[in-house]
Amino acid sequence: PSIANHFSTSRFTSRGICLTDPPPQRIKNENGEMVYNPLYRKKDKLTHYVTKKRQYYCATLSELALQVKEGRESLIKRAAARLNMFYDYVLIDEFQDFREFDYELIIKLAKHLDDILLVGDYYQHSVSARNNTGKPFKTPKGDVSYADFVECVMNAGFEIDTTALSKSRRCSVDVCNYISSKLEIGITSTGDHEGHVIWADNIANDVLSNDQITKLVY
């Protein structure tokens, strides 16, 4: 099945992908009230996933791929067959940052791949309290714990390895010990670097303004 045939658009030709978000279903009017957005297109229309310039919305690509099917055949099976043809392994890094349709796409795609490896750290996920809707971080029962996350991935058919990458090459022994004792996260260090945990309450501005100090903030 093709995307064009799925939406009964036989002559559709895409022009790539854009990073612009698609029009939301509801928007605020001048009075601050939520009203229907006339630019919104329903999910059963190709224009829900494609701009007027025939570019796919990046934000809805996974959702689109999941629904294109015809009988027992699907776009996911077709994509997996091509990946298997050209690649021995499919490697996905930062797996913990995938959720909702992106997460579902990976899980369903994996069922048809010859070999796939997912690498990720639950405790480094970028999902916050504001955007934690959907799998694997939100279920009808509530938020998902580390144990729940591991069980969810295991139930999807994956073998779980929690030890191979348990040693950090980035963090020092002191930092790892601090994390383990305060947050009860099982992490150790390879000991390749020196580093200490310090409180910068009184020198925060000096640290931020000092270009000689490497920081993970902007």
Where are these regions (language model features)?
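The feature marks helicase ATPase cores and/or their adjacent C-terminal helical subdomains
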Residues: P1-Y218
